[in-house]
Structures are given as C-alpha cells and as structure tokens.
Swiss-Prot record:
Any single GO BP term: carbohydrate metabolic process
Protein name according to UniProt: Alpha-xylosidase
Top-level lineage group: Bacteria
NCBIfam families: PRK10658.1
Family of this protein: Belongs to the glycosyl hydrolase 31 family.
Amino acid sequence: MKISDGNWLIQPGLNLIHPLQVFEVEQQDNEMVVYAAPRDVRERTWQLDTPLFTLRFFSPQEGIVGVRIEHFQGALNNGPHYPLNILQDVKVTIENTERYAEFKSGNLSARVSKGEFWSLDFLRNGERITGSQVKNNGYVQDTNNQRNYMFERLDLGVGETVYGLGERFTALVRNGQTVETWNRDGGTSTEQAYKNIPFYMTNRGYGVLVNHPQCVSFEVGSEKVSKVQFSVESEYLEYFVIDGPTPKAVLDRYTRFTGRPALPPAWSFGLWLTTSFTTNYDEATVNSFIDGMAERNLPLHVFHFDCFWMKAFQWCDFEWDPLTFPDPEGMIRRLKAKGLKICVWINPYIGQKSPVFKELQEKGYLLKRPDGSLWQWDKWQPGLAIYDFTNPDACKWYADKLKGLVAMGVDCFKTDFGERIPTDVQWFDGSDPQKMHNHYAYIYNELVWNVLKDTVGEEEAVLFARSASVGAQKFPVHWGGDCYANYESMAESLRGGLSIGLSGFGFWSHDIGGFENTAPAHVYKRWCAFGLLSSHSRLHGSKSYRVPWAYDDESCDVVRFFTQLKCRMMPYLYREAARANARGTPMMRAMMMEFPDDPACDYLDRQYMLGDNVMVAPVFTEAGDVQFYLPEGRWTHLWHNDELDGSRWHKQQHGFLSLPVYVRDNTLLALGNNDQRPDYVWHEGTAFHLFNLQDGHEAVCEVPAADGSVIFTLKAARTGNTITVTGAGEAKNWTLCLRNVVKVNGLQDGSQAESEQGLVVKPQGNALTITL
C-alpha cells in the first residue's frame, strides 16, 4: 500500500502511529521484548491514553533474527501459517545497556536504540547492513475503509539491489517496483505472478522473509527510494532477517528454514513432450508423435497428456474420456514399453457436469460460501467448484483418485492452476480466507506430492507445478506458466526463472517454443536451445503441436543436438541438482549469485549460470546476434573450444545449433557416455574435461550416483607445470581431456591421444601426473 504522499505528507485518510521511545526492555526466555511508545512517556501524565508497541526479537535458527511488532495482541490469528523449521535451542545473546538493547544470533544482531531518536538496526559482526529509522515503521489506520495495517521500512544503501519476491517476469532487479504478493493467473507478460513469495534478498548479502501468508504489499525503492517498505493488514507484523553473507549462504539458511527443494529423479531431466492444450489428440495422435521422434532419432523421455485426457466440462474427476482413450491402461502400458514416463494434467477444481459433482457436494468436499452454499463460477469450467483441501476426507478422496492413476501406470502429475482462490468463502477447518488464497497452492501441491511419495517413493516423485507459496520448493518441478511464442516472452520467462531461483526454488522449467500462438521456426529453435539448457525441458503449447517437424527440418536437428548434449551433461547437472537439494542453490542462477563481488553482474537478466561452472546466454534474435558478459577469468566454449577473457562484454553471432555456453577456468567438468537418456550410470565411461587450470589451483569434480550422493571424486592440482590428478571412489574407463592443450612434456601412469578439443589422457588406474 501507498502510505506516504511525497516526502512530507501521508496519503489522505491515513493515521500513522510509530514506535518512538523505548519504555522498557525485558528478557523472556530466549526472546528480547521491547516496549516502545509513540511519544515521550517519561512523565506519568504521558503514560495515559497512548498505544504501546511490543517488539519481540527471537531466533528460529542460527543467523536468523525474527522481529514481531505487535499492536493489539487479542486479534484473531487463524491459520494457515507457513510451515517453518523453528528450532528451540538456538544460542542467542541479549545485551541491555543504557544506550541500546541488542539481540544476537550467529553473526547477526538487531539493535534498538534508546533515548530521543528511535532506530532499529541490523548488524553483521557489528557493521550495519540495514534497519529502520524514526517514523519508518508502525501502525496505519485507514479511515477510508476502516482497516488497519502494520508496516516496516528497511533501508537500502547506495548501489544496493533487491531480488526475489517469487517468480516475477518484470525486471530482475526489484528496485523501483511495487509488488503485491497475491497469486494470480496472469501469464508471463504482466506484473502478476503465479508464485508470490514474500522473501527478498539484496546484493549486500542478507534476505528478509515477511511471515504472513496473506497479501503483503512491497514498495521496493519506489514509494521511498532508499527503502524497502512492506505492509500487511494485521495487528502485528512479523519478519525475519536472514544473514548470508553471500547470496548462496542466504538461500542456504532460507531453505533450511522453509524447506529444501527435493531431488527430482534423473529421468525428469530428459525431454518432455505434450499433447498441447486444446489440440485434437487420441492414442493414434500420441503414437504418431512418439514414433516420429524415434524415426528422427530424437531422444524422448516423458510424454504428457494435457487436459483433454478427461471429458470436456468435467475437469477434474480423473476419468479418462472413453471416446478418445478407450483403453487407457493398455495405452499407458504400450507407451511405457517404449521407455517413456507418463505425466497427466490435473487441477484442484471440478466442473458441475461431472457425474461425481453431486457426491462431492453432498459429502462437503467442495469449498463453500459463508452462507453454506457452494462457491461456484463459470470461468474455466461451467459451474466450477474448488476442492476444499482443508477437509481431510476431501484430501483422501482426491488422493485415492490419483493413486488409481498411479496404479494404472502414471508416473507424475502436472499440478496446474491453484491461483484464483476466492476469499468470500468458509473453509472446512476455519482457515482465514485471506491467508488461504496463496497458501492453497502449498497444500494442493503437498497433497499430490505425498501421493507420489506414498506410491512410487520420494526418490521417484516429481510434479510439474505452476502455483506456489512459501515452502512449495519442497515439491519440484515448477514451470513458468503461459508465455507467448516470441523472443520477448522467452526473455521474460528467463527473468521469471532467475527470480524464482532467488526465492528458494531449485528447479524450474518453461514452455519451450511459447504457449500462446505458434512461434516462427527461428523462435522455436532458439527457445529449444535455451530450454534444453534449463534444469527441466518440456515442449508444450496451446492450440498447436510442438513436435519439431511441425516447424522445419532444422528444428529436428536442433532438438536432437541439445537433447543429446543435455543427456551427456547429466553427471554435471545431477550433481548440481544434488547441491540444490542439499543447500538450496538453484540449478539455474542469476549471475550475481555466483559472482556477488562483481558489480557488473548485478543487473544481468539475459544470461545465467547453469550450476557452478557453466555460463549460458540464450540468443533472442533471428540473426543470432547476442551480447553477454563474462566475469573475471579465462572462459572456454563447451563445444566450440574458443577461449575468451573475462571482466568484459562480448558480441557474437550464432547459428541455430549454437549459443554462448562458456565454462569458467579451473573447472573439471564431467560428461557422460550416453546421449540418449538422462538416467544411466554416470561413473562409467565418464569423460572429464579440464579447463584452464591455473598454477596453484585445484579443480574438483564429484560424480553422482542415482540418489545424488557422490560415488567418484576426481581432483586435479597444478603446481608450476605439473598437474597431479587423483581419483577416489568407484569409476570405470574414465578419461581426461586437457582442453586446448595439444601436447605435454610428460605423462605418468596413462596414455594419450589427440582430439579436436585437446589432448585426451586415459589413466592406468585412478592417478595421473602430467607435465605441461
């Protein structure tokens, strides 16, 4: 909400009350409690007829400081609440002096100044990183609508940039933006978002989570240009400041607090193909796609059935349309015999025409209005109603339907929708409708995830989800939603992917080729390269098919090349996936996350790091012109082998079988021996590639097993002109390519052979000594 009117005034109809003077400080168990008055209350006369704010400082985990500013403590506080991992035994330090009261957890502390001028400062090792000054937090009474709000304004320093707040398609840097965290089905080309997360981080190495599931209004360097303002309709405001000091460390703490991204199964990293949305399809159509892919030597790993696997006007009752798919169980069995995994579309709604609608209504499984009638409308499906997942019996009914599909052979679900959840309703468990609007996405996806966890096992569970709330990163994968089939939408999709990665989500995808309309062949081919260098890759559209031969012959070449490349990259990619699971670092990440000390990376949103070591710059032009920035170091193209210096911008032109994909120096990269499948034994026949190992440096490569654990580790250390290579663990028939090295002066315990990319060394055991 807008509170101020310029620098001197406030918006008409608003009354503001601020904490201005510390009255008393108490220690209550592990909390520091500060009582603050909105005026000087040193004289007893002024202690009457005045509000008194209660500020609670606490720590749910080391390096995280919680702040709760309370006005009236007797207000209702119905759930839902975010499922946070709150620890009870966090070591904290509380100091209460004449000048200030300070609460410390880890290296992070919150300090409240006493005396004439109010200030709340957050410090890392004694150095201020942010905070709020006098009259920059407090209580808002809106006489226009008789509503009350709490707000906070945290300072932004010179050059400080803000990121996150969910999957947003606007500029990557949030400075200057107004953000309302209210899930909406708005596509990728608007300010609306499917996945609103009231968490942001800055390039100063800290994050802030506002602990309110309802709509939180952010003014990010907009209303007050040097502050992040956030407000919520409530009698209290609770937020957490999360220490880094690096962006990766912030996400490590944040996902430890809100939940780690689960590790998707290896097969999910392959190529997904769908029926598209409103196209006509039956088993013959599906077979023509799958056989066409095989005939053209196009690797395919997952086939997805979109909405019309069910009868029209009945979504979702989980019954196959018998006219289109008379033998679904047999069809699925035949498809799986071809080595495919099967995904089907679902959503959390039910059309009135469905034969089960009356049963669901009578049993109380659908969301009701306060007067007891069903909440219904005619958008999406006629007479549409919403499953009430706060009713355990409704959850069981829904889950049993999904389990029946799994028993039929379905491997995973596309959990679509879940954004347009109304507020003029009465939930079964009495949940606050304002809070449930966003949180519904969490309980919906959690329900479906648990079905897969209980049936196929957590190690095989994967979703393709569109809506999300805080904590939903535990249920991957998430995709960007409805985008147009043009370069602008391709770029805005990338911004959304980087943004959600900066919000704690480890795995992300997008509709390759665009969803709305049909892309020209050149857009499709550029998007395929980008899509197959994303964590997850799906060909999907609305009114037209997305098989590559529907565009042109070269599209088949592009899909083949990049699918095979991704399959070969799986030893590297899956180890990065395991790191996302372990620490919350997204596989696709903004450049500023990997290079936080390079200010040139702060605003980059048309390129990204794919894991720790590989920079990808998608091409957004038909002609192939692309500009990209490389940070400090010497970078080598993954397959062209050309080398570029970092700390500068580069301009290039690429054909459709190419784009800038550069590996940073001092990297040991593992490529697999299979270009047809993502799920194979990665530690057999592994081709390690060593890129520009500098004197005094060591490169380490960890090869994962199917569960993400490390099964083999290769290290290369350089001293002068000598490179010592040692391996530990289980590996067979591995080789080492010294990129852009054509000959060596000496080699111990191995043999060598020339290749276009560099000298290839084959060890006799698990150790090598190379003299350059």
